[in-house]
Amino acid sequence: MMRQSVQTVLPESTGNNTLSLRDSVCRDLFQLFSSPHSPLPILLVSGMPEWQGHNQSDKLLQSWYCRQLRSALLFHEPRIAALQVNLKEAYCHELAISLEMMLYHDDEPLTFDLVWQKGNWHRTMPQ
């Protein structure tokens, strides 16, 4: 009986792989926020309009939103090792958030900024 062996070469972790990982995570996060069938809780993906009856400057409400969003994103995106959610602006019909994260197999932090305006999420470039 003859044995056959197959050699498998694992891809090296290069800058391009890291870049494509980062792009992939950002693309998937934006899709998670933008999809009408998103598994995220409706309040987390539909922005501030749900808060019209509340005080948008309420720090407890903002903190609750950030904790809920962080928990949901960590559950749905397993490539994120660490995540911090920050509210940059919170108005009645506009919400700006910043996601600062560390990905597994990536040594550099990644910032992903989103703005809820006119009923949709828009990606913004970090400043």
From Swiss-Prot:
Domain of life, per lineage: Bacteria
Gene Ontology molecular function: anti-sigma factor antagonist activity
Localization in the cell: Cytoplasm
Gene name per UniProt: iraD
SUPFAM superfamilies in the record: gpW/gp25-like
Role played: Inhibits RpoS proteolysis by regulating RssB activity, thereby increasing the stability of the sigma stress factor RpoS during oxidative stress. Its effect on RpoS stability is due to its interaction with RssB, which probably blocks the interaction of RssB with RpoS, and the consequent delivery of the RssB-RpoS complex to the ClpXP protein degradation pathway.
Keyword Cytoplasm among record annotations: yes
A GO cellular-component term linked to this record: cytoplasm
NCBIfam families in alphabetical order: PRK14128.1-1, PRK14128.1-3
GO biological process: cellular response to oxidative stress; DNA damage response
Family, per entry: Belongs to the GpW/Gp25 family. IraD subfamily.
Pfam families for the chain: GPW_gp25 (PF04965)
Entry keyword Metal-binding: no
Keywords: Cytoplasm, Stress response
Description of how the protein assembles with itself and partners: Interacts with RssB.
Protein name according to UniProt: Anti-adapter protein IraD
Gene source species: Escherichia coli O1:K1 / APEC
